[in-house]
Amino acid sequence: MAKNYYDITLALAGICQSARLVQQLAHQGHCDADALHVSLNSVIDLNPGSTLGVFGGSETNLRLGLETLLGVLNASNRQGLNAELTRYTLSLMVLERKLNSAKGAMDTLGDRIAGLQRQLDHFDLQSETLMSAMAAIYVDVISPLGPRIQVTGSPAVLQSSQVQAKVRASLLAGIRAAVLWHQVGGGRLQLMFSRNRLTAQAKQILAHC
């Protein structure tokens, strides 16, 4: 069956968007608020109608992720910030595979996310309460699967409990996107052998944004 590179690229951009948010938070203590909202909301919407629906139904919502994806796919410089983004992206993919193979982990994750939906009746998506709850899910369900993702940035910034919670919530969103990526036919070999196809698709989607 032919692979749907549109959906694969959208999901991959979702992973990259989370990686970029983590990087922004770790270095600056703040991030693109609109992109963060899209990524966090993707965790909570458990019944989207389409791959694009996971990210709010608009390609523009993934602009940051698409731009990051192009940077990761075409990085001639494997050092510094580009290397960080590549490492975060690949680490999220590895953790998703561990989540998929760990007995009961996906069910536990689903139950905990259902709890988030109930909290949304009382709190805003980007409230400290929701951020802390998402961070706790990452710590309790994802982190024990290993290997842990080493987040690098400003030590002073990373000492902030609020930044830590946003970083972990963003990583949880990255796991959500990685699950979606596999569901629509994504695989790590594509990063090596279908790089040109993914690059062309990402550029085509960005042209609409």
Curated annotation (Swiss-Prot):
Disulfide bonds: none annotated. The keyword Cytoplasm applies. PANTHER family: HIGH FREQUENCY LYSOGENIZATION PROTEIN HFLD. Residues 79-121 form a coiled coil. InterPro entries: HflD, HflD-like_sf. It is a peripheral membrane protein. Belongs to the HflD family. This is High frequency lysogenization protein HflD homolog. Keywords: Cell inner membrane, Cell membrane, Coiled coil, Cytoplasm, Membrane. HAMAP family: HflD_protein. One of its GO terms (cellular component) is cytoplasm. Its main location: cytoplasm. It is found in: Cytoplasm; Cell inner membrane.
